[in-house]
Amino acid sequence: MILNQGQSLTLKLGSTITVGTCLTPRLIPELQKSCPDVKVSSNVSNTRAIEQKLLRSELDVGIVEGEIYSPDLHVLPIVDDRLVLAVGKEHPFYLKKVLHVQDLEQEQFAMREQGSGTRQLFEDYATRHQISFQTVWEANSPGTLLNAVLYDGVLSVMSLRLMYHEIRNDSIHVFQNENGEWNRKFKLVYHKNKFLTPAVHELERILHSYRNVEIPENAGILR
């Protein structure tokens, strides 16, 4: 948190791409309404990049979904999130209600870039279950991945929070992991030596109001 020449406080907020797409645009207006003297500067990147920016004091606070490894950063899990398997209408899985992990063998996927928490979680899952898949799309934009699912017939694994519109209009069918292996948290992260201003505490309070995730009634199951 820094003081500008105009005597207004600036909070440098970092968000991962998933968080920056589905949550940060809502958080910032709420925070500025509660703290009108605070100007929020937003930076969106993947988990690894946000971690490094926090360590270099280029950001005051971050909200991430991936794993943070530095012992110099304090991590506070707050918001529930779930990855789901996204399937478009042209894919044979679209009409199914239940899939098994073996069904994913050699399927074509649209994936996030290396350094993404979403990608890491799914790759760890694939390794545990000894399945191989083909990455035919790679992008750091959730919109690009969604369009690949919609129009190119590939699969993708991404946050449920990114697809509510497509799920409601039945253009995408999703499968949730039955064992909860894709459940995760959005986490508030800051340097352990960071002085926490009232704006950071208010950001934490606002985050708690988003902690629950809505599961669609027609979601399929991946076993």
Task: Locate each region found by the language model.
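Hydrophobic hinge/microswitch elements
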Residues: N46-E51, L55-L59, V64-E65, L121-V174
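Short beta-strand->loop
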Residues: H74-V84, L160, N169-N183
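Secondary-structure junction motif
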Residues: F93-Y94, E107-H129, L160, L196-R205, ...
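Central regulatory/effector-binding core of bacterial HTH transcription factors
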Residues: S8-P71, A139
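Short, well-ordered beta-strand segments
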Residues: T10-G14, G62, A86, A110, ...
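Residues embedded in well-ordered beta-strands
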Residues: V84-A86, P92, L155, H173, ...
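A late-sequence structural motif
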Residues: C22-L23, H173-P216
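Flexible hinge/capping segments at coil-to-helix
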Residues: N4-Q5, S70-F109
